[in-house]
């Protein structure tokens, strides 16, 4: 298992989590292909984290799955916008930390035995 962490992304964590949920559990190659065509800003950052995690482990993208994709809230940048009559309102610019873990795609023993039993039933 290998991981990659990208910190202080200028993107709201709630928006990034929508994309992170989509790719969790997918094959890394399939996840990168689907992220490439997503119009969201966070898709580029999550794709970067996935490819970095794959490279950190020394794997190929087609032999690993995205086992975990977590988005945490980072520091919030606070800015002020001038308003009427000398007042000001606060602008919050949230940041995110993206953690991606990839692991080898292994077929479990249960799945193979179920597949064998199903093929035996079809033959008889």
From Swiss-Prot:
User: Which GO-annotated molecular functions does the record name?
Assistant: rRNA binding; structural constituent of ribosome
- Keyword annotations for this protein? Ribonucleoprotein, Ribosomal protein, RNA-binding, rRNA-binding
The job of this chain, per UniProt, is described as: This protein binds specifically to 23S rRNA; its binding is stimulated by other ribosomal proteins, e.g. L4, L17, and L20. It is important during the early stages of 50S assembly. It makes multiple contacts with different domains of the 23S rRNA in the assembled 50S subunit and ribosome. The globular domain of the protein is located near the polypeptide exit tunnel on the outside of the subunit, while an extended beta-hairpin is found that lines the wall of the exit tunnel in the center of the 70S ribosome.
Q: Name one GO biological process term.
A: translation
Respond yes or no to whether keyword Ribosomal protein is given for this record.
yes
Q: Which organism is it from?
A: Campylobacter lari (strain RM2100 / D67 / ATCC BAA-1060)
- State whether it acts alone or in a complex, and with which partners, per the record: Part of the 50S ribosomal subunit.
Q: Which SUPFAM superfamilies match?
A: Ribosomal protein L22 (SSF54843)
As for family, the record states: Belongs to the universal ribosomal protein uL22 family.
The cross-references to InterPro entries, in alphabetical order and at most eight, read: Ribosomal_uL22 (IPR001063), Ribosomal_uL22_bac/chlpt-type (IPR005727), Ribosomal_uL22_bac/org-type (IPR047867), Ribosomal_uL22_CS (IPR018260), Ribosomal_uL22_sf (IPR036394)
Gene Ontology cellular component list: cytosolic large ribosomal subunit
Q: What is this protein called?
A: Large ribosomal subunit protein uL22
């Amino acid at each position: 298992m290998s991981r990659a962490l990208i910190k202080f992304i200028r993107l709201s964590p709630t928006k990034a989590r929508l994309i992170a949920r989509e790719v969790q559990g997918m094959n890394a190659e399939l996840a990168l292909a689907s992220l490439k065509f997503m119009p969201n800003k966070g898709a580029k950052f999550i794709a970067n984290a996935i490819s970095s995690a794959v490279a950190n482990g020394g794997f190929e993208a087609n032999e690993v799955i995205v086992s975990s994709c977590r988005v945490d809230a980072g520091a919030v940048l606070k800015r002020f916008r001038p308003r009427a009559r000398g007042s000001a309102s606060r602008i919050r610019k949230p940041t995110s930390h993206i953690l991606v873990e990839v692991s080898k795609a292994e077929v479990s023993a249960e799945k193979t035995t179920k597949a064998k039993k199903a093929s035996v039933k079809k033959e008889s």
